[in-house]
Amino acid sequence: MFCLPQQESTAPTTCTGSASTQDMDSGYGDGLQGECLRKPDQTQPKLYGVGDPTATFSSDSSCLSSRGRVIKWFWDSAEEGYRTYHMDEYDEDKNPSGIINLGTSENKLCFDLLSWRLTQGDMLHVEPSLLQYPDWRGHLFLREEVAKFLSFYCKSPAPLKPENVVVLNGCASLFSALATVLCEAGEALLIPTPYYGAITQHIYLYGNVRLAYVYLDSKVTGLNTRPFQLTVEKLEMVLQGVSSEGVKVKGLILINPQNPLGDVYSPEELQDFLRFAMRHKLHVIMDEVYMLSVFEESLGYRSVLSLERLPDPQRTHVMWATSKDFGMSGLRFGVLYTENQHVATAVASLCRYHGLSGLVQHQMAQLLRDHDWISQVYLPENHARLKAAHTYVSEELRALGIPFVSRGAGFFIWVDLRKYLCKGTFEEEALLWRQFLDNKVLLSSGKTFECKEPGWFRVVFSDKENRLRLGMQRMRQVLEGQSQVVEDASPCHAQEPQSQPR
């Protein structure tokens, strides 16, 4: 986690950060300490939690540029858990004592369905145009299928247009591209926390764009409130605080369904947030990468593209990918839908570096046009498997007396382990994360999502039954041991967990 020492601020809910960690990630790296490459710019405002990201690097420790050292630092410090997992990955036959990964948000439940569909005859096609340079927005045949797909599954009130579609190799590239074309270096985007921490890296490494954190907490203040609830009032407070510190805010990032909370924004909330952005002339980046992974129908999920009227369509940009909903995180495919042709053209220009091969574009077009298979075979079975896995992990957590937040969207449960911390600090959270890893189960810690309350963890449940059972057994072993440690330590007062919806 890259967060420089915080300084006093008159806006305690505001933190502008310049880096974070990856989703696979749950890692607590050691961080690099060394001589400053150069002194921080004295003219830069003393922002809450912000400084010169190159200041921790030795001037003679590497052949890399200062920018290259920052990039390497991310790799060294932010992915320890994921690298450790890959060096000791669990295999039922070859490595039964290896690490179970309940930290990376991937859907591993439907490989049988996907492998069948991706090996059908219509997927195997080669023609000259697929081997030549394409339109950088993506081949027209693919953009037409994407527009039809989003129109149908987002339930848009009018058909979406292929000229508003840009395709590229995943949402990480899309975040990088959007931040670069929408923001000047040093400007910021608002984002509610906890959030998918890799976004900070995506927008910072290329565009030098930062995030202004809208810190949310687990406290429930009334009948109509819920844990970690975003409101317009909180957005206004952080926007004013960051602006008063001399940082220009250019937009708002919303993840819906939410990662790591497994919750969704209501249509009314979406409209409120969009109107807030319009009042302040902010772009809104809507990340809807889990839109087809809502397995509780009672949630009533609505895509922003389903709204009858967008307050500011020229500043509303929607992203989606196959990584989550179709369990294809290794097949890089992401989509931008925007009515702003200046934004679409600028992002398309960057697709020279983030484009898709013609063969992959053909395969994706074939997949997305197969509404019968998607609606009648894949989605019902995927939702059933997600729900069964979610039910199992939820019951295990209840048996342990562990509160959690999860309303039936995505692949994860946001788990409250604060009572297992001897002290309510992120150092204690890191020690607990390390205990899990030492006991061969990888989780994602709350710090990697910029959660303001130490002791929260994200548990991914979208895996096969045997791995889930073993992973939960290993979690239980750690927590039972930690309970004894907390009980024996004196004086030691664990923070009482607040009641959370189950």
Swiss-Prot record:
This is 1-aminocyclopropane-1-carboxylate synthase-like protein 1. Does not catalyze the synthesis of 1-aminocyclopropane-1-carboxylate but is capable of catalyzing the deamination of L-vinylglycine. Pfam families: Aminotran_1_2. Substrate binds at residue 106. One of its GO terms (molecular function) is identical protein binding. The modification N6-(pyridoxal phosphate)lysine is found at residue 324. It comes from Mus musculus (Mouse). InterPro entries: Aminotransferase_I/II_large (IPR004839), Ethylene_sulfur-biosynth (IPR050478), PyrdxlP-dep_Trfase (IPR015424), PyrdxlP-dep_Trfase_major (IPR015421), PyrdxlP-dep_Trfase_small (IPR015422). SUPFAM superfamilies: PLP-dependent transferases. Residues 1-24 are annotated as: Disordered. One of its GO terms (biological process) is biosynthetic process. PANTHER family: 1-AMINOCYCLOPROPANE-1-CARBOXYLATE SYNTHASE-LIKE PROTEIN 1, BIFUNCTIONAL ASPARTATE AMINOTRANSFERASE AND GLUTAMATE/ASPARTATE-PREPHENATE AMINOTRANSFERASE-RELATED. It comes from the Eukaryota. Keywords: Pyridoxal phosphate. Gene3D superfamilies: Aspartate Aminotransferase, domain 1, Type I PLP-dependent aspartate aminotransferase-like (Major domain). Belongs to the class-I pyridoxal-phosphate-dependent aminotransferase family.
